[in-house]
Amino acid sequence: MIEAAAQLYCVPEVEYTLQTYIVEGRQVLVATIEETPHKPVYAKDETGKPLAYLRIKDENILATPIHLRVWQQSDSPRGELIRYTEREQLLLDQLEHGTLLSLNRYCRQTGLSRRAAEHLLAKFVRYDIVEPVFENHKFYFRIKDE
């Protein structure tokens, strides 16, 4: 069953190791899946739709569009120039006081489209300026500690 899940439901296919232990006369199978350097790995849901997840404290959390953009940008072979405009300054101003900022609140307060906000946050996450924080089953963003 583990082999079928790794091959049929994961894109790209994930590698794993299996170990068997005998505990109190019962056989225990431990499957270990190491973190892959090539992200994201998509898992198909019940309808066949591919979804990407993050592993946080033994929980599988659905990846946000920002995570997907960070991974997409990281796989790009060429670099990307960041222009420092009012939009970038506005984001830094929003995060300046150490407050946690949600994507929705950022869009509302700045009037940016969701797509533009995702793109900008992904760039800042990719370059270690901003970090995602998972709190109360929701992602927020803050200036990354040095």
Please provide the spans of the model-predicted regions.
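Conserved N-terminal catalytic/coupling substructures associated with nucleotide/phosphate chemistry
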Residues: 1-146
